[in-house]
Amino acid sequence: SDVYKRQTYARPDWDKLLNNLFPKEIILDDLDAVAYANGPGSFTSLRSAAAFTKAIAASKKIPLIPVSSLKAMAWESKKWVKQLPYIIHVCNVAEKENLYYAAYNLDSNKIDVVTEPTLVTKDFIKQIFNNEDYLIGDAWKDESFASRLVTDYVSFSADAVVSIASSYIIQKKSFSDSD
């Protein structure tokens, strides 16, 4: 049966993959840097993204820029919140009773860390909740947070990662895995 087909671990066709990822007009030699979302998130996905982008950056001798997934989600919130600047609390379910949490101050073209990404409990987020700030992420589904919830949709676009990475380049920020 097709359900039980063997999984193969064949080497991917990198040329085909790169051709699908990059439009024909983009040439790898034209890149100034490579950015990727460095978590928190699925370990396997993060490891794959880091390895793939590190290989490109190393071979082209260009900077590799890690961007926090939580920071990218916060940046994405500007699609829904038009009143700038604002503070947004990003909180996603991690595992067991833990949550991934960070807070950011957003303006039209910059994002500052208010609270570094960390693991917290539900009790913690109930204590820090403020009716003035905005919320994004799947850990805010409790009714008491509903009035300030931007979205519980847990995602971000490559555009958010690129925008943040571009701001780092403009600021000539040094790049580290801790973003």
Q: Where are each of the predicted segments found?
A:
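Residues at secondary-structure transition points
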Residues: 8-12, 43, 47, 51, ...
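Short, well-ordered amphipathic alpha-helical segments that serve as non-catalytic structural scaffolds
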Residues: 9-25, 70
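Oxyanion-binding and handling regions
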Residues: 9, 65-179
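Phosphate/pyrophosphate-binding loops at sites that engage ATP/ADP/AMP, CoA/4′-phosphopantetheine
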Residues: 18-33, 128-133
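DPxDG-like acidic metal-binding loop motif
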Residues: 33-69
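Short amphipathic alpha-helical face segments that pack within enzyme cores
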Residues: 13-16, 51, 55, 72, ...
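Short, charge-rich binding segments
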Residues: 26-27, 58, 80-81
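Short, small-residue-biased leader/transition segments that mark boundaries at the very start
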Residues: 2-4
